[in-house]
């Protein structure tokens, strides 16, 4: 059986990267929450 996690840095950046987050209002909300929480790493 094929495993569910097949790592790809390109897909990782496109789906969870900073620019992907900034592209949508809900994504910007995620960044806002993570900044408020004090996360050093905001996105993948």
Swiss-Prot record:
GO molecular function, one term: structural constituent of ribosome
Keyword Ribonucleoprotein among UniProt keywords: yes
Record InterPro entries: Ribosomal_bL34, Ribosomal_bL34_CS
Pfam families: Ribosomal_L34
Assigned GO CC terms: ribonucleoprotein complex; ribosome
Source organism superkingdom: Bacteria
Keyword check for Ribosomal protein: yes
Alphabetized Gene3D superfamilies for the sequence: 1.10.287.3980
Residues covered by region (Disordered): 1-44
BP term (GO), one: translation
Residue spans of biased composition, Basic residues class: 30-44
Record's keyword terms, sorted: Ribonucleoprotein, Ribosomal protein
Family: Belongs to the bacterial ribosomal protein bL34 family.
Protein name per its UniProtKB record: Large ribosomal subunit protein bL34
Organism the protein comes from: Rickettsia canadensis (strain McKiel)
Gene: rpmH
């Amino acid at each position: 059986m094929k495993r569910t996690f097949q790592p790809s840095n390109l897909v990782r950046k496109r789906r969870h990267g900073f620019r992907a987050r900034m592209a949508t209002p809900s994504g910007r909300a995620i960044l806002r929450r993570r900044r408020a929480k004090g996360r050093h790493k905001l996105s993948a």
